[in-house]
Amino acid sequence: MTTEDDKGGRTATVSRWLPFSCVDGPGNRLVLFLQGCNFRCPGCHNPHTIGLCDHCGDCVPGCPSGALALIDGRVRWQASLCTHCDRCLDACPRSASPKTHQMSVAEVLVLLRRYGPLLTGITVSGGEATTQLPFVVALFAAIKAAPDLAHLTCLLDSNGSLGETGWQRLLPVLDGAMIDLKGWRESVHHSLTGQGRERVLASLQLLARAGKLAELRLLQVPGRSDFLDAGGGLDAGLTDFLQTLGPVPIRLNGFRHHGVRGEAMGWQEAAMEELDRLSNALKVKGFGPVSLPPL
């Protein structure tokens, strides 16, 4: 959750952060992973970022290193004792983590200044970053207002569920958004995310009109995705929709078992041949550039 700290600065619940990444947008980027997500994707590869800790304490007894304790009704994590065995993540009934922490806008700016000479920009991801929208807006605004940081691009990695009012708050300080589309037909999208597709499609069109759709990401799940028709060509409805976006980079992601739980462990992993077919179908219709993952 996003809160105001006692100095009036925005804070957010953060799962973790990376000082350098070359896979979360162009260039070398600092990545902030915010906790909490409003989708329930069976194939999520970071399921421990979905929920928020309610301090039930279920994770405490199973910690082999004694890094967790229930003190005054709150779970406390001692990083110096933690071996990162992740048993606490498996024990959590809320798909949360006891290892999250609060970070303020000011603290993120300190990190950006520390690593700034080596950075192209910052990407805020999740979970779902827009569930903590006030923090993201405040952070990006602070970066744009700081002369020594203004050269850094501010990108968002999102599921596209934010409504138009929220996007209008964010657009003035946003350089671009990378949006996931995990299914085309309503029924398929719902089965893969737990939510409908309407807001995602609206977000894609809004960002495209604003010139801030940095990347469209399509997830290919064998036997479940519906981007291709029965003949192996691009679905006609998807073709019509993509034409409304104009030129946009497309990244294909193939489903993998890494990190997933439950029923999705029984799903087939995507082979490169399947991604090649989708890539070729997109290119035949003139969409792209299309990039493939290093499976």
Where are these regions (language model features)?
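Conserved AdoMet/S-adenosylmethionine-binding subsite of the radical SAM
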Residues: A106-G266
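Auxiliary Fe-S-binding modules of radical SAM enzymes
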Residues: T2-P26, Q220-L295
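Short, conserved glycine- and acidic-residue-centered signature motifs
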Residues: H101, T193-G196, A271
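Short Fe-S-cluster ligation motifs
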Residues: G66-D72, L81-C92, V110-E128
